[in-house]
From Swiss-Prot:
GO terms for molecular function: ATP binding; ethanolamine kinase activity. This is Probable ethanolamine kinase. ATP binds at residues 93, 252. Belongs to the choline/ethanolamine kinase family. Keywords: ATP-binding, Kinase, Lipid biosynthesis, Lipid metabolism, Nucleotide-binding, Phospholipid biosynthesis, Phospholipid metabolism, Transferase. GO terms for cellular component: plasma membrane. The keyword Kinase applies. GO terms for biological process: phosphatidylethanolamine biosynthetic process; phospholipid biosynthetic process. PANTHER family: CHOLINE/ETHANOALAMINE KINASE, ETHANOLAMINE KINASE. The lineage of its organism: Eukaryota, Viridiplantae, Streptophyta, Embryophyta, Tracheophyta. It catalyses: ethanolamine + ATP = phosphoethanolamine + ADP + H(+). Disulfide bonds: none annotated. Involved in phospholipid biosynthesis. Catalyzes the first step in phosphatidylethanolamine biosynthesis. Pathway: Phospholipid metabolism; phosphatidylethanolamine biosynthesis; phosphatidylethanolamine from ethanolamine: step 1/3. The gene is EMB1187.
């Protein structure tokens, strides 16, 4: 909790230096293991503590409902009838337990304000011991099948192109291999209390896994891929769409960092498969070209040269392999640390097996591309 407070203090110190509005912080910690009915009074108490104009309101004026149940965080919608009887809604995001092993919260909080200022995601309204409060976005969360709709795919590509142009202060060094190796060091030392999980865990060859990481790092380095501020978690659940306004929102930047452009796009294409990892749903070359054209030239996608599109296509195909390694190793840690009911170890094998299946095809594609460009 002290670390969380220090992060918010650092963020507010930067605001103070720029005469910007301070973001309120509460030392409250909400027990995420509680069932929702028992959690609601604590959430109301938290909101009253954070936002002083709500402090004297009766609890009956608050309503709390779950709006998302991902495999990392818990999102709650809190609606309040203020003195004017006008209803105001905010989103309370509760971090999953032990997520500090896979998420750099300092990096997230210091970036989120710049992204919000650039028009991305929800506005940051406050922070607390194990989460944050943001403005509520009136839109629906996308499903994996939505992302392949040509119109929505083009919207996502345009939005991502703008996102990658945002300048976030600090080191511009790509974090992909730093994060993967950090995950690897943690994952390789774990033990499980459940015999079945431990037995399955022991079938993982960490020596082989480490060799794959180093080989892929060296191989993708041959591409000299551009480095951008990347979202790094472009699954369907991190896009929201207001159908009436046809407005798309990119949300949740907790994995965001400077990274290789191809990783962000390749990771997004992998997410067409959903949590079930049905990779028959991976976008076709035609669908990828459609996306890449709108990413590179949102106003004139048909004027992008085939050479430009092919270059990004190959870069994306290479880094989709890194996406498989990243989330495969992440899943091992989550299998040990997360209280959420999800077959994380099974997910590791689904991602790692797909990595091994795609590796020879991708290596051949990239090698041919590099040879042709000499």
């Amino acid at each position: 909790m002290g670390a969380a407070k220090n992060i918010w203090a650092l963020a507010n110190a930067e605001d103070a230096a720029n005469d910007a509005e301070q973001i309120p912080y509460s030392s409250f910690v909400v027990d995420t293991s509680l069932p929702l009915p028992l959690m609601i009074p604590r959430i109301i108490e938290l909101c009253k503590d954070l936002f002083k104009n709500w402090g004297e309101l009766d609890d009956s004026l608050f309503s709390v409902e779950r709006v998302s149940g991902g495999i990392t965080n818990l999102l709650l919608k809190v609606s309040v009838k203020e003195d004017t009887n006008k209803e105001v809604s905010v989103t309370v995001r509760l971090y999953g337990p032990n997520t500090e092993y896979v998420i750099n919260r300092e990096r997230e909080i210091l970036a989120i304000k710049y992204l919000s200022a650039a028009g991305f995601g929800a506005k940051l309204l406050g922070g607390f011991g194990n989460g944050m409060v943001q403005s509520f976005i009136n839109a629906r969360t996308l499903e994996p099948s939505d992302m392949r709709e040509p119109k929505i795919a083009a919207q996502i590509a345009r939005e991502l192109g703008k996102f990658h142009k945002v300048d976030i202060p600090g080191s511009k060094e790509p974090q992909l291999w730093v994060d993967i190796l950090k995950f690897y060091e943690k994952a390789s030392t774990l033990t499980f209390e459940e015999p079945d999980k431990q037995k399955l865990f022991e079938t993982i060859s960490f020596e082989e896994l480490h060799k794959e990481i180093i080989e892929l790092r060296e191989f993708t380095g041959l591409l000299n891929a551009p480095v951008v501020f990347a979202h790094n978690d472009l699954l369907s659940g991190n896009f929201m769409l207001n159908d009436e306004e046809e407005k798309l929102y990119l949300i949740d930047f907790e994995y965001g960092s400077y990274n290789y452009r191809g990783f962000d796009i390749g990771n997004h294409f992998n997410e067409y498969a959903g949590y079930d990892c049905d990779y028959s749903l991976y976008p076709s070359k035609e669908e990828q070209y459609h996306f890449i054209k709108h990413y590179l030239q949102p106003d004139k996608p048909d004027e992008v040269s085939i050479a430009e599109v092919e270059s990004v296509f190959v870069e994306t195909d290479a880094y989709k392999l890194a996406s498989h390694l990243y989330w495969a190793i992440w899943a091992i840690i989550q299998a040990r640390m997360s209280p959420i009911e999800f077959e994380y170890l099974g997910y590791f094998f689904l991602r790692y097996n797909e990595y091994k299946k795609q590796k020879p095809l991708t290596f051949s594609l990239v090698t041919s591309h590099l040879s042709a460009s000499l």
